[in-house]
């Protein structure tokens, strides 16, 4: 019996977030430059496996099961910069599947260690930090090669509509309800673009006046989980015409704000959370009535060695 009030669940999968079991919204009080605009972080590390990608992994698998492409004892393969892989590994464990994940050796040690700890078969490759489509020796190419074997399935978070659908069904409704329908700006770092696409579409359907803002890192960045403009051209879920704003944040801006979030707000936010917040500060004006929600993708625990 799942009970979101008493927080009693039949299995760990019952803890996956949704409109009746949302991840928290926490107002920022010390790092914001505003007098009037209210800024909230949506703390996605409260998902059971620690990141916003838990939503995506769960829906990718559920969609595959519904389509009967995910079979009993299925062998899954997925290229990742860490968070999707960790969520897929743990959900696979709960359902009797297995996961092979090709990834870059530049992915933080904490993530690579946890993937192995969770039971994934980790294949470290000489790839860019975020898997690069078109790289013949990269993680995406390796996963595609493995998926051609008859006993493997690649869920393909970079093109699968089940990715944004997860956020259309959960993240968007959560934010609309948690802000009592008052959200004016939704801000998100760009990786696969599933979060901004699904959440943004839902919020725009509720009110066309909601501003959807996408934040990307500089070229040559070292922030896992987000993609530069050049890298974004490769994901099939990047729809910039649907955004009201798009802006770049530097490594230094992201890492500096990451430290401030931890040390001044006592929020254990990672660098991909900070990059989204830094972009919000650049794009959102200080006006009465502004209610800004920024996706804080995951915690700093997986990045401490690379931030400090």
What does each model-identified segment do?
Residues 1-308:
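PLP-dependent amino-acid enzyme catalytic core
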């Amino acid at each position: 019996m799942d009970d979101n009030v008493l927080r009693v669940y039949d299995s760990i999968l019952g803890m996956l977030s949704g409109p009746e079991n949302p991840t928290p919204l926490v107002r920022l009080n010390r790092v914001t430059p505003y007098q009037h605009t209210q800024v909230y972080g949506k703390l996605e590390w409260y998902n059971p496996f620690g990141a916003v990608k838990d939503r995506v992994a769960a829906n990718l698998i559920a969609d595959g099961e519904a389509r009967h492409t995910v079979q009993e004892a299925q062998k899954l393969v997925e290229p990742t910069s860490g968070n999707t892989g960790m969520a897929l590994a743990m959900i696979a464990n709960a359902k009797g599947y297995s996961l092979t994940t090709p990834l870059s050796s530049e992915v933080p040690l904490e993530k690579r260690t946890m993937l192995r700890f969770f039971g994934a078969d980790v294949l470290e490759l000489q790839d860019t930090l975020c898997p690069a489509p078109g790289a013949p020796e990269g993680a995406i190419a390796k996963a595609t090669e493995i998926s051609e074997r008859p006993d493997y399935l690649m869920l393909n978070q970079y093109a699968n509509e089940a990715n944004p659908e997860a956020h259309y069904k959960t993240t968007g409704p959560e934010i609309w309800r948690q802000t009592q329908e008052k959200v004016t700006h939704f801000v998100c770092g760009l990786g696969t673009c599933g979060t901004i696409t699904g959440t943004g579409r839902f919020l725009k359907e509720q009110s066309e006046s909601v501003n959807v803002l996408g934040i990307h890192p500089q070229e040559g960045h070292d922030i896992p989980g987000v993609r530069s403009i050049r890298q974004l051209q490769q994901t099939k879920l990047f729809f910039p015409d649907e955004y009201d704003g798009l802006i770049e944040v530097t490594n230094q801006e992201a890492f500096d704000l990451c430290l401030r979030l931890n040390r001044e707000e006592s929020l254990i936010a990672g660098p991909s959370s900070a990059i989204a917040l830094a972009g919000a500060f650049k794009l959102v004006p200080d006006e009465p009535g502004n209610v800004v929600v920024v996706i804080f993708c995951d915690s700093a625990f997986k990045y401490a060695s690379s931030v400090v």
